[in-house]
Amino acid sequence: MSTLARTAHVTRQTSESTIDLQLDLDGTGASEISTSVPFYDHMLTAFAKHSLTDLRVTATGDTHIDVHHTVEDVGIVLGQAIREALGDKSGIARFGDALVPLDEALVQSVVDISGRPFLVHSGEPAGFEMHLIGGHFTGSMVRHVFEAITFHAGLTVHVTVLGGRDPHHIAEAEFKSFARAFRQAKELDPRVSGIPSTKGAL
């Protein structure tokens, strides 16, 4: 089992956004989030809290045009930071799953820290992607965030919406269930010696 600090500090600057992100996978869920997209701040705060990942994010971007660039770019950087902080993945549980309700919404997430990026995202009700949540964040952004994290962190992720009506509740349950599943998958298990794969690498 690795004894190295599982932390990362990643920055990204483009013509569309500027991002500075720090995380600690073995934290307590503390967070300081400022992306200029309030609902996204709320979702990232929930992710940090329920995954027990300490997370600091400062992001600015061309939100006067659309929130898409800033939201997706933060997801990219978060994925890169997760990948860096995981290191060689020695001693991790690797797999995690969680079923999380928020009032009428119910979402299941399954995570495999596999090194093979793959996202299966299903079950959102018809029209969800068109809803404005919190005034600026469209429902379609939820999938974009998971795509960005999954690809850049090297995760296999299944997120399945099993029920729900309120777009806020559905989106929040998605982030929370992903967080809980990721929390299980990234945990260090003292019984695991080396890389949790018969191939010897992830």
Curated annotation (Swiss-Prot):
Keywords: Amino-acid biosynthesis, Cytoplasm, Histidine biosynthesis, Lyase. Its EC number is 4.2.1.19. GO terms for biological process: L-histidine biosynthetic process. GO terms for cellular component: cytoplasm. GO terms for molecular function: imidazoleglycerol-phosphate dehydratase activity. It is found in: Cytoplasm. It catalyses: D-erythro-1-(imidazol-4-yl)glycerol 3-phosphate = 3-(imidazol-4-yl)-2-oxopropyl phosphate + H2O. Pathway: Amino-acid biosynthesis; L-histidine biosynthesis; L-histidine from 5-phospho-alpha-D-ribose 1-diphosphate: step 6/9. Its main location: cytoplasm. Belongs to the imidazoleglycerol-phosphate dehydratase family. This is Imidazoleglycerol-phosphate dehydratase. It comes from Clavibacter michiganensis subsp. michiganensis (strain NCPPB 382).
